[in-house]
Design a protein with these regions (language model features):
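Switch II of P-loop NTPase G domains
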Residues: 1-45, 50-65, 69, 125-137, ...
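Conserved beta-strand/loop subsegment of P-loop NTPase cores
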Residues: 12, 41-48, 64-90, 106-118, ...
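Active-site-proximal flexible loops/turns
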Residues: 22, 55, 74, 86, ...
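C-terminal-of-GTPase-core extension/linker across diverse P-loop GTPases
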Residues: 89-168
Length: 168
Protein backbone atom coordinates (compact mmCIF):
# COMPACT_ATOMS: atom_id res chain seq x y z
CA UNK A 1 0.00 0.00 0.00
CA UNK A 2 1.40 3.38 -1.03
CA UNK A 3 -0.70 6.19 0.43
CA UNK A 4 -0.76 9.57 -1.30
CA UNK A 5 -0.04 11.28 1.96
CA UNK A 6 2.00 10.24 4.99
CA UNK A 7 0.73 11.51 8.34
CA UNK A 8 2.77 10.50 11.38
CA UNK A 9 0.92 9.53 14.53
CA UNK A 10 1.36 12.07 17.30
CA UNK A 11 0.69 11.66 20.99
CA UNK A 12 0.92 14.66 23.26
CA UNK A 13 1.34 13.92 26.96
CA UNK A 14 0.27 16.46 29.56
CA UNK A 15 1.63 16.08 33.09
CA UNK A 16 -1.15 17.04 35.47
CA UNK A 17 -0.54 17.53 39.19
CA UNK A 18 -1.59 14.65 41.42
CA UNK A 19 -5.07 14.33 42.81
CA UNK A 20 -6.01 13.88 46.45
CA UNK A 21 -9.14 12.73 48.25
CA UNK A 22 -11.72 15.50 48.24
CA UNK A 23 -10.60 16.95 44.90
CA UNK A 24 -14.15 16.87 43.58
CA UNK A 25 -14.99 19.22 46.48
CA UNK A 26 -12.08 21.52 45.62
CA UNK A 27 -9.50 20.20 48.09
CA UNK A 28 -5.82 20.39 47.14
CA UNK A 29 -5.46 21.31 43.49
CA UNK A 30 -8.69 19.42 42.82
CA UNK A 31 -10.57 21.92 40.70
CA UNK A 32 -7.47 22.69 38.62
CA UNK A 33 -6.78 18.97 38.16
CA UNK A 34 -10.36 18.25 37.13
CA UNK A 35 -10.44 21.13 34.64
CA UNK A 36 -7.09 20.05 33.17
CA UNK A 37 -8.20 16.44 32.80
CA UNK A 38 -11.35 17.51 30.95
CA UNK A 39 -9.10 18.69 28.12
CA UNK A 40 -7.51 15.29 27.41
CA UNK A 41 -8.75 12.43 25.23
CA UNK A 42 -7.42 9.63 27.44
CA UNK A 43 -5.79 9.18 30.84
CA UNK A 44 -2.48 7.50 31.63
CA UNK A 45 -2.63 7.06 35.39
CA UNK A 46 0.89 6.63 36.78
CA UNK A 47 0.60 4.67 40.03
CA UNK A 48 3.38 4.53 42.60
CA UNK A 49 4.42 0.94 43.25
CA UNK A 50 7.83 1.46 44.90
CA UNK A 51 8.80 1.96 48.53
CA UNK A 52 11.15 4.80 49.49
CA UNK A 53 11.81 6.56 52.78
CA UNK A 54 13.06 9.56 50.77
CA UNK A 55 9.72 10.15 49.03
CA UNK A 56 6.75 10.43 51.36
CA UNK A 57 3.40 9.26 50.00
CA UNK A 58 0.50 11.66 50.53
CA UNK A 59 -1.49 8.88 52.28
CA UNK A 60 1.48 7.76 54.39
CA UNK A 61 1.87 4.36 52.72
CA UNK A 62 2.21 2.88 49.25
CA UNK A 63 -1.01 1.16 48.15
CA UNK A 64 -1.60 1.32 44.38
CA UNK A 65 -5.07 -0.27 44.57
CA UNK A 66 -6.17 2.41 47.07
CA UNK A 67 -4.64 5.17 44.94
CA UNK A 68 -6.42 3.94 41.80
CA UNK A 69 -9.72 3.75 43.69
CA UNK A 70 -9.22 7.28 45.08
CA UNK A 71 -8.68 8.76 41.62
CA UNK A 72 -11.55 6.79 40.08
CA UNK A 73 -13.95 7.86 42.83
CA UNK A 74 -12.97 11.53 42.52
CA UNK A 75 -13.61 11.38 38.77
CA UNK A 76 -16.95 9.65 39.40
CA UNK A 77 -17.98 12.24 42.03
CA UNK A 78 -17.25 15.00 39.54
CA UNK A 79 -19.23 13.13 36.87
CA UNK A 80 -22.25 12.77 39.15
CA UNK A 81 -22.35 16.57 39.50
CA UNK A 82 -22.01 17.06 35.73
CA UNK A 83 -24.68 14.48 34.90
CA UNK A 84 -27.05 15.88 37.54
CA UNK A 85 -26.69 19.42 36.13
CA UNK A 86 -27.44 18.10 32.64
CA UNK A 87 -30.41 16.10 33.95
CA UNK A 88 -31.84 19.17 35.70
CA UNK A 89 -31.49 21.26 32.53
CA UNK A 90 -32.91 18.53 30.27
CA UNK A 91 -35.82 17.77 32.63
CA UNK A 92 -36.86 21.44 32.47
CA UNK A 93 -36.66 21.40 28.67
CA UNK A 94 -38.67 18.14 28.60
CA UNK A 95 -41.81 20.03 29.64
CA UNK A 96 -41.86 21.66 26.22
CA UNK A 97 -40.13 18.94 24.18
CA UNK A 98 -41.21 15.35 24.85
CA UNK A 99 -38.51 14.06 22.46
CA UNK A 100 -36.02 14.54 25.31
CA UNK A 101 -37.56 11.72 27.38
CA UNK A 102 -34.91 9.21 26.21
CA UNK A 103 -32.13 11.56 27.31
CA UNK A 104 -33.74 12.08 30.72
CA UNK A 105 -34.16 8.32 31.21
CA UNK A 106 -30.55 7.64 30.24
CA UNK A 107 -29.20 10.40 32.51
CA UNK A 108 -31.12 8.91 35.46
CA UNK A 109 -29.70 5.47 34.69
CA UNK A 110 -26.21 6.94 34.23
CA UNK A 111 -26.36 8.75 37.58
CA UNK A 112 -27.47 5.54 39.33
CA UNK A 113 -24.56 3.73 37.64
CA UNK A 114 -22.09 6.37 38.83
CA UNK A 115 -23.55 6.36 42.35
CA UNK A 116 -22.75 2.64 42.49
CA UNK A 117 -19.07 3.62 42.11
CA UNK A 118 -18.85 2.52 38.48
CA UNK A 119 -17.19 4.64 35.79
CA UNK A 120 -19.26 6.11 32.96
CA UNK A 121 -17.23 4.13 30.41
CA UNK A 122 -18.87 0.92 31.69
CA UNK A 123 -22.52 2.03 31.43
CA UNK A 124 -24.59 0.06 28.92
CA UNK A 125 -25.41 2.08 25.81
CA UNK A 126 -28.61 1.03 24.02
CA UNK A 127 -28.89 3.50 21.15
CA UNK A 128 -27.46 6.55 19.38
CA UNK A 129 -29.24 8.98 21.69
CA UNK A 130 -27.57 7.47 24.74
CA UNK A 131 -24.17 7.45 23.03
CA UNK A 132 -24.64 11.09 22.05
CA UNK A 133 -25.55 12.05 25.63
CA UNK A 134 -22.47 10.24 26.94
CA UNK A 135 -20.23 11.86 24.32
CA UNK A 136 -21.51 15.39 24.93
CA UNK A 137 -21.65 15.42 28.74
CA UNK A 138 -17.83 15.60 29.15
CA UNK A 139 -17.65 12.90 31.81
CA UNK A 140 -14.18 12.22 33.16
CA UNK A 141 -14.79 8.56 33.97
CA UNK A 142 -15.89 7.95 30.38
CA UNK A 143 -12.33 8.54 29.15
CA UNK A 144 -10.17 5.51 28.36
CA UNK A 145 -7.51 4.77 31.01
CA UNK A 146 -4.08 3.14 30.94
CA UNK A 147 -2.50 2.30 34.30
CA UNK A 148 1.30 2.66 34.38
CA UNK A 149 3.23 1.29 37.36
CA UNK A 150 6.02 3.54 38.63
CA UNK A 151 8.56 1.05 39.96
CA UNK A 152 12.13 1.18 41.23
CA UNK A 153 15.11 0.15 39.13
CA UNK A 154 15.68 -2.70 41.60
CA UNK A 155 12.27 -4.12 40.72
CA UNK A 156 13.31 -4.47 37.11
CA UNK A 157 16.59 -6.20 37.92
CA UNK A 158 15.06 -8.60 40.48
CA UNK A 159 11.82 -9.11 38.56
CA UNK A 160 8.67 -7.04 38.80
CA UNK A 161 6.66 -10.04 40.03
CA UNK A 162 8.49 -9.80 43.37
CA UNK A 163 7.06 -6.30 43.98
CA UNK A 164 3.99 -6.79 46.22
CA UNK A 165 2.59 -3.44 45.10
CA UNK A 166 2.78 -4.37 41.42
CA UNK A 167 0.67 -7.46 41.99
CA UNK A 168 -1.97 -5.44 43.84
Amino acid sequence: YNPDKFTPAVIEFVDIAGLVKGASKGEGLGNKFLSNIREVDAIVHVVRCFESDDIIHVEGSVDPARDIETINLELIFSDIEMAQRRLDKTAKALKGDKSLQGEVDFLKRLIAHLENGLPARSVEINDETEQNVLDTTALLSAKPVIYACNMSEEDFTSGIESNKNYNA
